[in-house]
A protein has these predicted regions:
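Long, internal low-complexity/basic segments
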Residues: 1, 38, 416-424, 430-435, ...
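Active-site-proximal N-terminal segment of extracellular/periplasmic enzymes that hydrolyze or transfer
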Residues: 1-40, 46, 438-445
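Active-site regions of oxyanion-processing enzymes, predominantly non-cytosolic
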Residues: 1-5, 106-113, 147-152, 156-213, ...
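Histidine-centered active-site microenvironments of extracellular/periplasmic hydrolases
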Residues: 24, 198-210, 258-319, 325
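Catalytic-site neighborhoods of secreted/periplasmic enzymes
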Residues: 53-157
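Substrate-binding rim/cap in mid-to-C-terminal beta-strand-loop elements of soluble/periplasmic
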Residues: 56-57, 225-230, 254-255, 259, ...
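A long, amphipathic alpha-helix that forms part
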Residues: 161-179, 217-266, 336
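C-terminal, low-complexity/hydrophilic appendages and adjacent surface loops
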Residues: 301-302, 371-441, 478
Length: 478
């Protein structure tokens, strides 16, 4: 069996029709979903970009022992294991963070192709001072990230020049040139729909035609009151346009798989690393990246819950309720290919769920910032059993690190009057409060204690070093 693994960065689950969206056009991914096992309870594990890819490629819950860091030479990775078993392995990506500056996530692949220019990739040097599309105070890193990006795309002329298009074109070309290299593992990683958001105008017109204001293509991560209502609507439209752009080009790759006669013996996996807040909880971004509130954002479902669909030969399509997380992808691929799963892997194969043999692989899911920094309130872990979700900051916290709502205005789009329960744990009952707006920790502390205890046991089973686990053994200081 061949494998094509597609990771699309910052892709909100609820922006896909197969997960219930009714206003964004995603016909190709919805078609893939109809032919796949779709995981309703797929959730991120290590957050954000680079930790997620390390989870995927090592099969480990890496937030328990590391953070955003290069891939070390001694960690067992999927490509090496598959290569040793006789697979031809290839990485094609435009996500710069996992290969630039010695990050080395290409290790183990027989070949890799980096499509240059995404985000702040230091690629092009002209124009020296490109004009910003809006007031700089509305942008994240306007003088560095945004201007570098504008240099990188200055000579873009057609849709084929966009990053996701270039990446999928390269993936199609590799398939065409390597038909004799079966079995293969093709890993495709596109940074879209991550910011900056500047899809072709025809995609934007689907969602906000006639807009005349500033183009906030890379909004700063902060409470969202810096945007007017029309700007916030347009930012959402830009992102939706990026989602449809990704759908278009992933669709072309899927069609090429069919045209090359590969479908009957090729598994396709589509997923992401995390989502994004577009005003939910009063926030813009996936976190707050600012000196005074760095990382002080709980990982609510808009960020923590992710799409995951797997189309594999012989598997019955349908929606499944089993928890699935990025560390599960490596053992799943190895299981389906008949390759022994290394002892280093902490994830669980989803193959029994794909075959309809099992309904669940674990009782709960953990989504977390790295926990290696000690007793900081700003390193949240989300613990869920599907009915209840506990947002846990560690036992000792500094309320000043979680007071972001105090600088948010009180207009209707700000959904929470207080933020992060003044820094303490938060508990939500998902069936009655899916938007996670009413913290019921005080009323259901016994439920919170149960989830917390399960989370500690899981961390122990993962071999979390005690120096990182110590601060997480207490639910909260009394």
């Amino acid at each position: 069996m061949n494998f094509v693994v597609i990771v699309s960065d910052t892709f909100r689950r609820d922006h896909l029709g197969c997960y219930g969206n009714e206003w964004i056009h995603t016909p190709n991914l919805d078609r893939l979903a109809a032919e796949s096992v779709v995981f309703e309870q797929a959730r991120a594990a290590s957050f954000p970009t680079v930790p997620n890819r390390r989870d995927v490629l090592t099969g480990r819950f890496t937030f328990t022992y590391c953070d955003w860091a290069p891939l070390p030479p001694d960690e067992v990775v999927l490509a090496e294991v598959m290569g040793t078993a006789g697979y031809r392995t290839m990485m094609i990506l435009d996500t710069p963070h996992i290969v630039a500056h010695g990050y080395n996530f290409s290790r183990g692949f027989h070949g890799w192709e980096w499509i240059r220019g995404q985000e702040h990739d230091e690629w092009r040097t002209s124009p020296r001072d490109p004009a910003l599309p809006c007031a700089p105070e509305k942008l994240r890193r306007p003088e560095t990230t945004v201007k570098q990006y504008l240099r990188n795309v200055a000579d873009r002329r057609s849709e084929e020049d966009y990053f996701v298009a270039r990446t999928m074109i390269q993936a199609m070309q590799w398939l065409e040139e390597n038909l004799e290299s079966q079995p293969f593992l093709l890993y495709v990683d596109t940074f879209d729909p991550h910011e900056p958001w500047d899809p072709p105008q025809r995609y934007v017109n689907l969602y906000d035609p006639g807009y005349q204001g500033e183009e906030v293509i890379y909004p700063r991560y902060a409470p969202c009151d810096f945007l007017s209502e029309p700007e916030l609507k347009h930012v959402r439209a830009l992102y939706a346009g990026e989602v449809t752009l990704v759908d278009t080009w992933v669709g072309r790759l899927l069609r090429r798989i069919d045209e090359l006669g590969l479908r009957d013996d090729t598994a396709v996996i589509f997923t992401t690393d995390h989502g994004f807040y577009h005003g939910e909880h009063g926030l813009m971004g996936k976190s707050i990246i600012a000196e005074e509130f760095s990382c002080a954002v709980p990982l609510y479902d808009e960020v923590a819950r992710i799409p995951l669909m797997i189309r594999a030969p012989g598997m019955k399509p349908g929606h499944r309720q089993a928890f699935a997380q990025p560390p599960d992808l490596m053992p799943t691929v190895l299981d389906l290919s008949g390759v022994r799963i290394p002892d280093t892997v902490q994830g669980t194969s989803l193959a029994p769920v794909l075959r309809g043999e099992e309904d669940h692989v674990r009782p709960l899911a953990l989504t977390s910032h790295s926990i290696i920094y000690g007793p900081r309130a700003k390193r949240f872990t989300t613990i869920t059993d599907g009915e209840w979700t506990l947002i846990y900051p560690g036992a000792r916290f500094d309320p000043s690190q979680a007071a972001a709502s105090s600088i948010v205005d009180s207009i209707l789009r700000i959904e929470k009057a207080t933020y992060a329960g003044a820094g303490g744990p938060e508990l939500y009952h998902l069936p009655t409060d899916p938007a996670q707006r009413r913290n019921v920790f005080a009323e259901h502390r016994d439920t919170a204690a149960r989830l917390h205890a399960q989370h500690v046991r899981m961390l122990e089973e993962l071999g979390t070093p005690e120096e990182h686990l110590e601060n997480r053994r207490l639910l909260a200081e009394s």
